[in-house]
């Protein structure tokens, strides 16, 4: 399912909640009866924050026991992010994986509010206090700020993949750029 920051934030009940999965992985790490962990991943991605939480938990878990990821239908974007730290990754030939990329979007309902005659006033402390305001388009400074954040996140994702798969960042960048791969091609 979708990787989310908290329960109930996914459109379905099958969401992968970052804090819950991380907590469960820590319990497995501390359980001496568990000798290895197979993590079945079936996710098209989701929250970068929750993916990072789970990535850290997988990395911590593998300091004490082997972690094997078994990819199902999807392990793309955040699904790949949480997988790449594993010791071993196994994919089905038809698994869709990769999609090493990040995007952000904020709706702009200005056209709608203009049509219905809705107006608003804003009082703020500085020029970015209402960053993400959906009642107007981004200004150039806000676009640059969002792009900087997205680029930082993408570079972190590339670094996590490189570290987890024991590859250089340059090698990861050649196969990244948001492209999706079948399990067979991967």
Predicted segments with their positions:
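Amphipathic alpha-helical substructures
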Residues: 166-185
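Glycine-rich beta-to-alpha transition loops that act as phosphate-gripper elements at the mouths
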Residues: 70-76, 175-179
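Small-residue-centered hinge/linker elements
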Residues: 1-65, 74-80, 84-164
């Amino acid at each position: 399912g979708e990787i989310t920051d908290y329960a109930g934030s996914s459109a379905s009940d099958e969401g992968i909640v970052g804090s819950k999965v991380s907590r469960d992985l820590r319990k497995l790490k501390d359980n001496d009866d568990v000798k290895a962990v197979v993590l079945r991943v079936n996710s098209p991605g989701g929250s970068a924050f929750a993916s990072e939480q789970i990535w850290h938990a997988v990395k911590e878990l593998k300091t004490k026991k082997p972690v094997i990821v078994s990819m199902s239908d999807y392990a793309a974007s955040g699904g790949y992010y949480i997988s790449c730290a594993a010791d071993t990754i196994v994919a089905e030939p038809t698994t869709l994986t990769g999609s090493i990329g990040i995007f952000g979007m904020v709706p702009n309902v200005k056209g709608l509010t203009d049509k219905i005659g809705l107006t608003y006033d804003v009082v703020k402390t500085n020029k970015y206090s209402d960053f993400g305001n959906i009642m107007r388009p981004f200004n150039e400074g806000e676009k640059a700020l969002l792009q900087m954040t997205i680029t930082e996140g993408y570079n972190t994702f590339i670094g996590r993949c490189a570290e987890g798969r024991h590859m250089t960042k340059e090698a990861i960048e050649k196969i990244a750029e948001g492209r999706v791969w079948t399990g067979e091609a991967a």
